[in-house]
């Protein structure tokens, strides 16, 4: 019983605004060094302006980058944009230990965001043909994962109160003309700080974790 309780605990790390590459490096190091007894973790972070190109990324989806850097990432998916006012949540879960599949984890993350948005009175949905979460046919949350040694890393990026213009410089997630939306378009005045605790709570509820911050 003690063993089970230990592994249903998840640790939360509040990282503020941090450059993409050091966080990516730390995430890789955490995943490489973890073993079967390592507790799972959630990392909440915002990144300065950056485009990240996923494993499936193609150069033709980079349209007019301007002065925003492009960084290659080993997450799934194509190109996306990160910037202040967007909540990124990285999920380091031992899915083998948790006995969940990758598709189950993706669905749990999408449902987490859908329920978080519902908390603020916004109706959102997932699409079977394009991972992520959508509101009125516009994308509000991007999702990209990597699995290594039976453990997940990378995660989601939820648009809350940010400058959406850089999304026009790319084909978001490889879809030309994909319309992007943010929560503040629907709930004026909403902040990242208001959304964070709800997002974490809904994620823990979805997968049965007890939070240890």
UniProtKB/Swiss-Prot annotation:
Cysteines engaged in disulfide bonds, as pairs: none
Annotated metabolic or biological route of this protein: Protein modification; protein lipoylation via endogenous pathway; protein N(6)-(lipoyl)lysine from octanoyl-[acyl-carrier-protein]: step 1/2
SUPFAM superfamilies in UniProt: Class II aaRS and biotin synthetases (SSF55681)
The EC number(s) this enzyme carries: 2.3.1.181
Domain of life: Bacteria
Miscellaneous remark of the record: In the reaction, the free carboxyl group of octanoic acid is attached via an amide linkage to the epsilon-amino group of a specific lysine residue of lipoyl domains of lipoate-dependent enzymes.
Protein name listed in UniProt: Octanoyltransferase
Organism: Photorhabdus laumondii subsp. laumondii (strain DSM 15139 / CIP 105565 / TT01)
């Amino acid at each position: 019983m003690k063993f089970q309780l230990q592994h249903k605990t998840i640790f939360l790390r509040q990282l503020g605004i941090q450059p993409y590459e050091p966080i990516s490096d730390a995430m890789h190091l955490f995943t490489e060094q973890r073993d079967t007894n390592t507790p799972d973790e959630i990392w909440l972070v915002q990144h300065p302006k950056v485009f990240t190109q996923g494993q499936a990324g193609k150069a033709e989806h980079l349209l007019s980058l301007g002065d925003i850097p492009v960084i290659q990432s080993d997450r799934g998916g194509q190109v996306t944009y990160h910037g202040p006012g967007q909540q990124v949540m990285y999920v380091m879960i031992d899915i083998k230990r948790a006995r969940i599949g990758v598709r189950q984890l993706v669905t749990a993350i999408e449902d987490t965001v859908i329920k978080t948005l519902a908390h603020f009175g916004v109706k959102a949905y997932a699409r079977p043909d394009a991972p992520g979460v959508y509101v009125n046919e516009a994308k509000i949350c991007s999702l990209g994962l990597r699995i290594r040694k039976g453990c997940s890393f990378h995660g989601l990026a939820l648009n809350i109160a940010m400058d959406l213009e850089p999304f026009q410089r790319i084909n978001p997630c490889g879809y030309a003309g994909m319309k992007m939306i943010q929560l503040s378009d629907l709930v004026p005045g909403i902040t990242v700080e208001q959304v964070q605790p709800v997002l974490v709570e809904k994620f823990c509820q979805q997968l049965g974790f007890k939070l240890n911050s």
